[in-house]
């Protein structure tokens, strides 16, 4: 038997924390070490336990998931933080990933999808729900003007303008 995945779950709603715990432990390959109600509480739990992964909600009182992710990744860079939330806000997604999150899943994902996401994050890859990927691609445009060396091609300023 392989070692179970050691997990901390952070969500301000007790029903969600408990539901995720029951669902993931039923897989037989996950051990939930602690439940936390804020990002700071998840960070404190990481100090006490040595998790492989933290499942983190994004919007929580006291210390949200982005702040919690930043604290955890600064102190424990080897711990994977996976955001699991109902929010598809691209601003939160980008900020969470910039602060070290290994991915972003929606709470309405199937139990198998969440477990698969945990495994993918542990393998070092970024996890992104399809709905979130589409939102990022639709709402994010990169405006980069084309550049080239006009002198190299012997173009006048007017020719470059055209």
Q: What does each model-found stretch correspond to?
A:
Residues 29-37, 45:
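Short hydrophobic/Thr-rich beta-strand motif most characteristic of the beta2 strand and flanking loop
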Residues 16, 35, 61-63:
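Residue-level signal for the "D+5" position in two-component response regulator receiver
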Residues 137-161:
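Regulatory hinge/linker segments at domain boundaries
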Residues 38-41, 62-67:
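Acidic catalytic/metal-coordinating carboxylates
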Residues 44, 66-78:
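Short amphipathic alpha-helix used as the core "switch/output" element in two-component signaling
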Residues 11, 57, 85:
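Active-site residues of response regulator receiver
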Residues 49-55:
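Active-site beta3 strand of CheY-like receiver
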């Amino acid at each position: 038997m392989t070692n179970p995945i050691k997990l901390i779950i952070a969500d301000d709603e007790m029903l969600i924390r408990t539901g995720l715990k029951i669902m993931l432990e039923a897989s037989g390959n996950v051990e939930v070490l602690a439940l936390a109600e804020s990002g700071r509480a998840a960070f404190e739990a990481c100090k006490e336990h040595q998790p492989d992964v933290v499942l983190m909600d994004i919007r929580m009182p006291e210390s949200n998931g982005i702040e919690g992710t930043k604290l955890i990744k600064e102190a424990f860079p080897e711990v994977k933080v996976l955001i699991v939330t109902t929010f598809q806000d691209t601003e939160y997604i980008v900020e969470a990933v910039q602060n070290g999150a290994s991915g972003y899943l929606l709470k309405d994902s199937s139990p198998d999808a969440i477990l698969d996401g945990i495994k993918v994050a542990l393998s070092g890859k970024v996890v992104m729900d399809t709905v979130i990927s589409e939102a990022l691609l639709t709402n994010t445009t990169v405006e980069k003007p084309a550049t080239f060396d006009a002198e190299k091609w012997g173009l006048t300023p007017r020719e470059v303008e055209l």
